[in-house]
Amino acid sequence: RLREIQDASKHPLRFRVSMEHFDEDKNDTIRGKGAYRKAIAGITCLAEVGFSPILTVTRTWKEECDSEMESQFVEVLRKSGVKQPQIKILPGFLLGQLAENERNYSQDEYVTEKCFEDFDITQLQCATSRMATGEGVYVCPILVDNPAARMGNSLGDTLRPFPLSHSACYTCRVTGMTCKSIP
């Protein structure tokens, strides 16, 4: 069915699958038991119908190891049948398990208007995209567990600006990170 939808659309259909590690045990320590196998099954299913999902991972290693880690993740995608492996490495957002393992955001880690004075706001995914889930449509994939980031039930409900008030917005700004899949 996904292939039919893609073939009928003038816009590309892209999928991103989130994992934390190429090792099953290390991934499941963060994502929960069985998460690795579910992700691999989803990646394999998408590859079988001709899609090349983008693998999104959160950096839990030193930045200088990015190249080595990316190679390992590319190998996981290739073994799953993905013809054009793409990896998106995100900085650590102090949310969920990472906040439990390390720390929460401090009172000083938030965005202000000054943060965006000489910054192209369209570089942030929230300026041009939304995250649709079974629970509604959210401003950002990082904030799908935050009820305040839920914008409505349909894409039509989200055709409006959203205040950049969450500390995760701070991480995007100070790291120069963008969730966009295409450079």
Regions found by a protein language model. Name each.
Residues 35-37, 67-75:
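Well-ordered, non-membrane alpha-helical segments in soluble/globular domains
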Residues 95-183:
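Accessory C-terminal segments flanking Radical SAM cores
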Residues 28-29, 66-68, 142:
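A short secondary-structure junction signal
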Residues 1-3, 66-69:
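Short secondary-structure transition/capping segments
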Residues 1-59:
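Radical SAM/AdoMet-radical enzyme domain recognition
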Residues 3-17, 72-90:
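Structural recognition of alpha->loop->beta junctions
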Residues 59-66, 83-108:
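Flexible glycine/acidic-rich beta-alpha junction loops that bind and position SAM and/or redox cofactors
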